[in-house]
């Protein structure tokens, strides 16, 4: 249709088009190798669309009708892949209409060209280097057409996959057809001496082979270890939840192997720790910053262990920031098992965008707070409200009246201090709590007992007591419920311990002294501004327990001491206890039973087969999985 010299001058358009195709497949291959699974970024379709437009022009210029026609059809499919996730997604009928119109518009110039130029070829052989090649016979042309149509049919396969699944992905059949069709076309263009298409189809064989290899390796992953669960709990509160979960799983099937990250309570249930929970005990920006290298090493060790062991289900218990990194890595590396997160991150308080991460990577989210269910009403993520496990744990707690004699504690009235579970928290909060006690009216009539969550932190507590010139005794956390029930009032660091105090109906004041950097981040960067910060106050929507939370300029020990004096009055104590009973009623409403929860989880996991008799024998101490 065009003069021969102009055809040769414009020949590089095809080369430039192949640069776009090559870039698209290079990006796709790189991301697939990185994520260990075949994936398709949006840039793949954009670059392919640009390349297709240029190849249509190349087909017109070089009088190669099959090239122009097939790239025209592919262009519509590229557009459909870009359009599928938009808010104005085209219907299948509209896409078919655009496809037919595109094919007609592509064919029309060749029909008109044949009318005005009877000698025009529809499949010319450029041979711009004038190689001494005889014209290919009819069989070569047939083989070439079969190769081209087979190669181009890959996107029709992908299109069908897209419309069925409503997801822009490249199935294994796409890559297989790409390789077979591309190989036939590659041989054909070698025979015709067409360098653009030799480069195009020759290079196209590489990503096809690479993706077929990735899919093959993924298919060769070992089957799930039928009696293997991975659990990870990085905090003491998570250790409590994890031990309850383990107890119910082991009651259901004692042969299941459970391994991962856990604390002393989980280890008592027969848990196999890869890393002890105590190694994760950091809080606040500075502590996390200086521990980042160690945390990264643990993260690498854990995800490699999971991929190697390939357990059927991964349970991540609280500790969301660390677990989010782990969950994302597992999915990117092709882990196909179920991922269940136990305890919803506080998206209702800050960083609400984490909800999208939960929906994208999780199979099930187990909730322990009653109001969290409302956050996922219109969400595709499966959620189960189990109720808080502390409710059943505390209701089944057997009080021992002789605990004071066992620990040689006098009958003097008690003020209980719960400074926290991490060294930094203990140092900051215990100072405030001791000073508040000494400034209160109870200093002369009461003794203070400090609850210690770990014996290795006892020296930290003794150092603070000595520094503040205060006599006090350290009580192991195993006696914390006896302590809560026998004390006149408690000062507790904001956290799970406050909810425990509320469920024990202990008159309590909440303290949480933050470091300067954490205070700045909370106030001005993350802007965590809420009417209340402790769980009892959040759940009930009222201030049951007075809160003193912030930096050193936000409150002082004298203010806390004034709150102690108010709380010491009988009417204040009774008011708190009544509110705590209302809190308990709220937590026990619409709770899913252990039987129901296990049945839901088992419906997702093939190896756990629950018999009615087994379910009836679940230990009564736990109302939450």
From Swiss-Prot:
Known pathway: Bacterial outer membrane biogenesis; LPS lipid A biosynthesis
Keywords annotated in UniProt: Glycosyltransferase, Lipid A biosynthesis, Lipid biosynthesis, Lipid metabolism, Transferase
Entry EC number(s): 2.4.1.182
GO BP: any one term: lipid A biosynthetic process
Cross-referenced SMART domains: LAB_N
GO annotation, cellular component aspect: membrane
UniProt GO MF annotations: lipid-A-disaccharide synthase activity; phospholipid binding
Region (Unknown): 1-224
Catalytic activity from the UniProt record: a lipid X + a UDP-2-N,3-O-bis[(3R)-3-hydroxyacyl]-alpha-D-glucosamine = a lipid A disaccharide + UDP + H(+)
InterPro entries linked to this entry: Glyco_trans_19, Lipid_A_biosynth_N
Stretches the record annotates as Lipid-A-disaccharide synthase: 225-625
Function: Condensation of UDP-2,3-diacylglucosamine and 2,3-diacylglucosamine-1-phosphate to form lipid A disaccharide, a precursor of lipid A, a phosphorylated glycolipid that anchors the lipopolysaccharide to the outer membrane of the cell.
Protein family according to the UniProt entry: In the C-terminal section; belongs to the LpxB family.
Name of the featured protein: Lipid-A-disaccharide synthase
């Amino acid at each position: 249709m065009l003069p021969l010299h102009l055809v040769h001058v414009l020949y590089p358009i095809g080369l430039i088009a192949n640069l776009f195709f090559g870039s698209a497949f290079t990006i796709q291959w790189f991301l697939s190798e990185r994520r260990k699974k075949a994936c398709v970024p949006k840039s793949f379709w954009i670059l392919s669309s640009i390349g297709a437009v240029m190849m249509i022009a190349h087909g017109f210029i070089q009088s190669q009708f099959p090239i122009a026609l097939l790239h025209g059809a592919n262009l519509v499919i590229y557009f459909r892949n870009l359009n599928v996730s938009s808010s104005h997604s085209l219907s299948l009928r509209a896409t078919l209409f655009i496809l037919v119109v595109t094919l007609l518009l592509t064919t029309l110039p060749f029909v008109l060209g044949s009318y005005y130029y009877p000698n025009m070829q529809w499949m010319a052989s450029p041979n711009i280097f004038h190689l001494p090649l005889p014209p290919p016979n009819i069989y070569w042309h047939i083989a070439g057409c079969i190769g081209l149509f087979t190669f181009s049919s890959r996107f029709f396969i992908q299109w069908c996959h897209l419309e069925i699944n409503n997801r822009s992905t490249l199935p294994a059949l796409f890559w297989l057809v790409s390789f077979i069709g591309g190989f036939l076309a590659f041989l054909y263009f070698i025979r015709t001496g067409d360098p653009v298409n030799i480069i195009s189809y020759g290079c196209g064989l590489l990503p096809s082979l690479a993706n077929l290899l990735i899919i093959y390796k993924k298919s060769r992953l070992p089957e799930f270890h039928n009696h293997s669960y991975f659990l990870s709990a990085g905090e003491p509160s998570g250790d409590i939840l994890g031990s309850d979960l383990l107890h119910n799983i082991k009651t259901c099937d004692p042969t299941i192997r459970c391994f991962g990250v856990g604390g002393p309570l989980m280890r008592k249930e027969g848990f196999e720790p890869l890393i002890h929970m105590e190694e994760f005990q950091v809080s606040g920006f500075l502590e996390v910053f200086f521990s980042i290298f160690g945390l990264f090493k643990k993260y690498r060790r854990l995800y490699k262990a999971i991929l190697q062991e390939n357990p059927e289900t991964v349970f991540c218990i609280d500790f969301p920031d660390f677990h989010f990194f782990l969950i994302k890595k597992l999915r990117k590396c092709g882990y196909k098992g179920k991922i269940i997160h136990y305890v919803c991150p506080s998206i209702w308080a800050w960083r609400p965008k984490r909800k999208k991460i939960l929906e994208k990577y999780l199979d099930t989210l187990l909730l322990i707070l009653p109001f969290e269910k409302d956050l996922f009403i219109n969400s595709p993520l499966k959620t189960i409200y189990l109720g808080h496990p502390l409710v059943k744990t505390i209701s089944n707690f057997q009080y021992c009246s002789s605990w004071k004699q066992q620990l040689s504690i006098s009958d003097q009235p008690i003020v209980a201090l719960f400074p926290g579970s991490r060294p930094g928290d203990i140092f900051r909060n215990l100072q405030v709590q001791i000073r508040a006690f000494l400034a209160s009216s109870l200093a002369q009539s009461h003794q203070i007992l400090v609850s210690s969550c770990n014996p290795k932190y006892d020296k930290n507590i003794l150092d603070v007591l000595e520094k503040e010139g205060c006599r006090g005794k350290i009580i192991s956390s195993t006696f914390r419920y006896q302590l809560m029930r026998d004390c006149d009032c408690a000062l507790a660091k904001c956290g799970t311990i406050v909810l425990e105090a509320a469920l024990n109906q202990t008159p309590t004041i909440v303290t949480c002294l933050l470091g300067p950097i954490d205070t700045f981040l909370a106030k001005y960067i993350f802007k965590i501004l809420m009417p209340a910060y402790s769980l009892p106050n959040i759940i009930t929507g009222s201030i049951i327990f007075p809160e003193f939370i912030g930096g050193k300029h936000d409150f002082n020990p004298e203010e806390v001491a004034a709150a102690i004096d108010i709380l010491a009055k009988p009417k204040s104590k009774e008011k708190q206890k009544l509110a705590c009973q209302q809190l308990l009623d709220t937590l026990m409403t619409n709770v899913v039973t252990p039987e129901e929860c296990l049945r839901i989880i088992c419906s997702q996991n093939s190896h756990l087969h629950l018999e009615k008799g087994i379910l009836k024998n679940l230990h009564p101490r736990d109302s939450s999985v």
